[in-house]
A protein has these predicted regions:
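Extracytoplasmic
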Residues: 51, 99-102, 125-127, 139, ...
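Juxtamembrane loop-helix boundary motifs flanking transmembrane segments in multi-pass membrane proteins
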Residues: 1, 5, 65-69, 214
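Short aromatic/hydrophobic contact patches that present stacked aromatics
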Residues: 55, 127-129, 185-187
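Short, solvent-exposed hinge/capping segments at secondary-structure junctions
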Residues: 109-115, 130-142
């Protein structure tokens, strides 16, 4: 049976090549997505130091990359005593030009200030900002496509979180449409010397499907 299978493969060389290419691309994609996931873990530790006292994700999931949290919780979270501000982020991945997998971040408007612009302006309707390392690799430095949607490049940023410099940031509403999720995570800033455990307890009362960590 094996000789017949080998004969069939050699008889159709184009089909065989396509199968090999498909396998290679799948393996590369797995490694790249794994790399992005590891980058997200690194990003978490940086966020907890400089970008939020509490991070909220979906509970009982195998990988934070697949987290989906209701962004509308922000309105309720902001009413909890000692909470100063909450922001949301969607994390995804997509091919961009010749790059097979690029990290895509959908950010709520109040998160844009976390990205230090080196060129241009923060994104508005149908616009994105790109990390410095990605920008240098783009052939078209005016526009990019994400999931068959075209976006104008409004600016270039440099983030203190090194992994983000290799990504693309766009308004969270567009990312929600592309990745079919509300928010990957919500970051909560609290007053100095606030009781974080008490705040977390109140946050968890809002939704049984979320997890909150300091």
């Amino acid at each position: 049976m094996i000789p017949f299978a080998l004969k069939a493969l050699f008889a159709n060389k184009l089909k065989t090549i396509l199968i090999y290419l498909s396998l290679i691309f799948s393996i590369i994609s797995i490694f790249l997505i794994s790399s992005i996931s590891n980058g997200i873990i690194s990003m978490y530790s940086s966020m907890l130091k400089s970008d939020g006292d509490i991070i909220i994700t979906q509970s009982n999931i195998s990988d934070t990359f697949f987290s989906n949290v209701n962004i509308n919780l922000i309105q309720k979270i902001n009413k909890i005593p000692d909470v100063i501000e909450s922001s949301a982020l969607i994390v995804g991945a997509s091919p961009v030009e010749k790059l097979p997998i690029v990290a895509i971040y959908g950010a709520s408007q109040n998160r844009f200030k976390n990205y230090k612009l080196e060129l241009g302006n923060y994104p508005k309707q149908n616009e994105v900002i790109v990390g410095k390392s990605i920008y240098e690799q783009l052939t078209n430095k005016n526009e990019i496509q994400i999931a068959n949607k075209s976006f104008k490049i409004s600016g270039v940023f440099k983030s203190e979180i090194g992994f983000e410099n290799g990504g693309v940031v766009l308004p969270i509403t567009y990312a929600a449409e592309i990745f079919n999720k509300s928010a990957s995570m919500i970051m909560v800033n609290t007053n100095l010397n606030s009781n974080l455990e008490s705040v977390i307890k109140e946050i968890k009362k809002l939704d049984t499907q979320i997890d909150a960590k300091t």
